[in-house]
Amino acid sequence: MLKATIEADIFRETIDAVSALVNECRLHVDEKGIRTITVDTSNVAMVSLELSASAFLTFAAEPCEIGLDIEKIRSMMSMIGKTDIVSLELDESGKKLKISFGGYEYSITLLDTKTIRKDPNAPNLNLPATFEVPGVMFNDAIKASSMVSDKISLAVSAETCVFTMNADGDSDRIKRELTGDDVHYLTCADARSLFSLDYLKDMGKSIGRAEKVQIRLGTDHPVQFSFVYAGGKGSVGYLLAPRIEAD
């Protein structure tokens, strides 16, 4: 059972964060809120999201799993006004989700959770560099880098504690360094890995809305991004595997 209302902006941020990587997901619902964890079809990236019941205007739920077709929900997002209140209600059969806003009422057929991939286990990674940067600065650097290349290196120097983003194309190059007040280190250590900009561009749309994004980085290891939204009542985590450089 699920019956809830939520502000349009929070609903939109929730859908955008998940749809950055996947078209469908298994949503876990209970009295504490909602959560999901899933990987993309190429097994290159993972997204996890939690949204507390307190982030909703009203929230009543019993433990259940919902199979969401994210693309269906995204298709209606342009119809939702910024000041709309979105109502969510699971029907008695558990096979349809009613989404209402601004005079519209959609009834969406849910996916059979048996057809959705099982939740992945979050890997326990040794990533020595942990730091925070403004979400908008990171996203701006990703957008700029994508104009010259399809890959980007993320690196930290233990000696200088400078975070460097470097994109090399066939003939052009973009480099962005964050130092001083723009980067806050929890642990400063040498780290460098190469990543696909296609994935980072998709993640960046949500990361760019966050005041701060925490980055955990190693050498030739996946990178982890985490940030909060909905006034700290929601959290998002991304994990992206590195691109292996040819010798």
Swiss-Prot record:
<comment type="subunit">
    <text>Homotrimer. The subunits circularize to form a toroid; DNA passes through its center. Replication factor C (RFC) is required to load the toroid on the DNA.</text>
</comment>
<comment type="function">
    <text>Sliding clamp subunit that acts as a moving platform for DNA processing. Responsible for tethering the catalytic subunit of DNA polymerase and other proteins to DNA during high-speed replication.</text>
</comment>
<dbReference type="InterPro" id="IPR000730">
    <property type="entry name" value="Pr_cel_nuc_antig"/>
</dbReference>
<dbReference type="GO" id="GO:0003677">
    <property type="term" value="F:DNA binding"/>
</dbReference>
<dbReference type="GO" id="GO:0006272">
    <property type="term" value="P:leading strand elongation"/>
</dbReference>
<dbReference type="InterPro" id="IPR022649">
    <property type="entry name" value="Pr_cel_nuc_antig_C"/>
</dbReference>
<dbReference type="Pfam" id="PF02747">
    <property type="entry name" value="PCNA_C"/>
</dbReference>
<keyword id="KW-0235">DNA replication</keyword>
<keyword id="KW-0238">DNA-binding</keyword>
<dbReference type="GO" id="GO:0006275">
    <property type="term" value="P:regulation of DNA replication"/>
</dbReference>
<dbReference type="InterPro" id="IPR046938">
    <property type="entry name" value="DNA_clamp_sf"/>
</dbReference>
<dbReference type="InterPro" id="IPR022648">
    <property type="entry name" value="Pr_cel_nuc_antig_N"/>
</dbReference>
<comment type="similarity">
    <text>Belongs to the PCNA family.</text>
</comment>
<protein>
    <recommendedName>
        <fullName>DNA polymerase sliding clamp</fullName>
    </recommendedName>
</protein>
<dbReference type="Pfam" id="PF00705">
    <property type="entry name" value="PCNA_N"/>
</dbReference>
<dbReference type="GO" id="GO:0030337">
    <property type="term" value="F:DNA polymerase processivity factor activity"/>
</dbReference>
